[in-house]
Structures are given as C-alpha cells and as structure tokens.
Swiss-Prot record:
Belongs to the purine/pyrimidine phosphoribosyltransferase family. Xpt subfamily. It catalyses: XMP + diphosphate = xanthine + 5-phospho-alpha-D-ribose 1-diphosphate. Converts the preformed base xanthine, a product of nucleic acid breakdown, to xanthosine 5'-monophosphate (XMP), so it can be reused for RNA or DNA synthesis. Its main location: cytoplasm. This is Xanthine phosphoribosyltransferase. The lineage of its organism: Bacteria, Bacillati, Bacillota, Clostridia, Eubacteriales. It comes from the Bacteria. SUPFAM superfamilies: PRTase-like.
Length: 189
C-alpha cells in the first residue's frame, strides 16, 4: 500500500534492526483516514471469503481492525492480553510470547463471541515472529471455527512470522513488507 509505505518512510523511525516506531500514525497517535484506507485494502482482498468476524489483539490492532469490520459490515472481537476481573464467563485462553515486550501473556476470548460456524479474519498491526497471530489462530481453532485469513498492516519480512504461518497453510496479506531495518534505515521488499 503506497500511502502506508510513504508514511512509514516519512514518519517511522527504525530504532534498531528489529524495532520500527510508527507511533505518529498507527499505535499511539492514530490517523483515522489512513486506518480507513487500510480497512479498504483488507476488505478488497478478503471480501469473497464469507468472513463472519474480525479478530484483533489489544491494543494496536484495534484501529485497523475496526475500520475493516466497518467496511465489511461484520462484528469485531478484541482478544484480551489478560483476563479482566469482569470476565467471569467461560473463556478460551492461550499463552503468547510478546516480541516487543519480551514477556508472556494470556490471550483471552470469551466463548460466547465465537461459534464453530464462524469464519475469522485476524487483523494485527505488526507481524514479526508470528507469536501473536499464532495465539489468535489457536483460540479460533480451539473453538472449532475457521481462520479465513490474516491481515497485517506492517510485516517485518526478515523475521520468521510469515514463514511460520504459511507453513501452517494460512493466507497472510500484508500492506507493507519490510525487508530490512537499521538505525535510520527502512527498506521495503
């Protein structure tokens, strides 16, 4: 997506060879017009699959996921990184390792928000090692539902996430694929 790549080059900052800071438009200060365009691209790519729900992981995937859900006119479910005290009902949970934070968390989904008839599109802000996406996949499949695709805003293609997901048969559609990061260096595929 040309507009996204342009924003990454203009406003993004590679802090090192693994970390890309895009807080000016994606995951702190959010540009709703850009998120709307992102939703348009995901809708166009995934619209023929009979998707019934969008799943995303709190919190940086919420903006692109809600815009995709709005355009596809389907519900969106936010997977929680920890079980809040208010969640007293039955849940699905799986442990996920966060690349960004360097720690584990319990990804949580209320059972009432998924059925075995659902076709799920997973949307996330970044794909690095694939741990978050694989965690979401585990929750969906534990519930007996189908993962119909995975939409990624920014993929770090030099890390193993895409390979891990494709080896398991999942279709990944990334709007910006980064080949290389380095101090003040951002290179796209």
């Amino acid at each position: 997506m040309e507009q996204l790549c342009k924003r990454i080059l203009e406003e993004g900052k590679a802090l090192n060879e693994y970390v890309l800071k895009v807080d000016s438009f994606l995951n702190h200060n959010v540009d709703p017009k850009l998120m709307y365009e992102i939703g348009t691209y995901f809708k166009e790519y995934f619209s023929a699959r009979g998707i019934t729900k969008i799943f995303t992981i709190e919190s940086s995937g919420i903006a692109p996921a809600v815009m995709t859900a709005l355009q596809m006119d389907i519900p969106m479910v936010i997977l929680k990184k920890q079980k809040p005290n208010t969640l007293t009902e039955d849940v699905y949970q799986t442990t996920v390792h966060s690349f960004t934070k360097g720690s584990d968390y319990e990804l949580t989904l209320l059972k009432k928000y998924i059925s075995d008839k659902d076709k799920i599109l997973i949307i996330d802000d970044f794909l690095a090692n694939g741990e978050a996406s694989l965690g979401a996949v585990r929750l969906v499949e534990t519930a007996g539902a189908e993962v119909s695709g995975i939409g990624i805003v920014i993929e770090k293609s030099f890390q193993k996430g895409r390979k891990c997901l494709e080896e398991k048969g999942y279709d990944i559609y990334s709007l910006a694929r980064i080949k290389k990061l380095g101090k003040d260096l951002i290179e796209f595929l």
